[in-house]
Amino acid sequence: MLRPPARHGYASCVHRIFTTSFASVYPLYVAKAERKGRTKDEVDELVLWLTSFERSDLERHLADATTFEQFFAEAPLNPNASLITGVVCGVKVQEVEDPLMQKIRYLDKIIDELAKGKAMEKIQRTP
């Protein structure tokens, strides 16, 4: 059976990442940062900045293996998240149609920026 082609906005289907546990991807974010000389603490700082979670919230989500969908449903997203722009996986994050996929791409983008050596102050956007 053939699948319909994926669209840039992902609005037409439930993407597999939505049901993937945040805890299963989190170590990949940390590993990516550490390979480039950055730290787990910096990854945590960015996750906390984006989600407006407390550290205890992050630890709970990791322990409970909540899905990305649940993770972002509970996250009071940082009001400056919409200032995150750029391309992840060939898609401009500011043009992603599905709100959940856009939040996931925001996270991917700021972790990419961290791994590329961008200063924390620049990654954590301010108007």
Question: What are these model-predicted stretches?
Answer:
Residues 9-127:
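A charge-rich, low-complexity, intrinsically flexible signal that marks solvent-exposed coils, linkers
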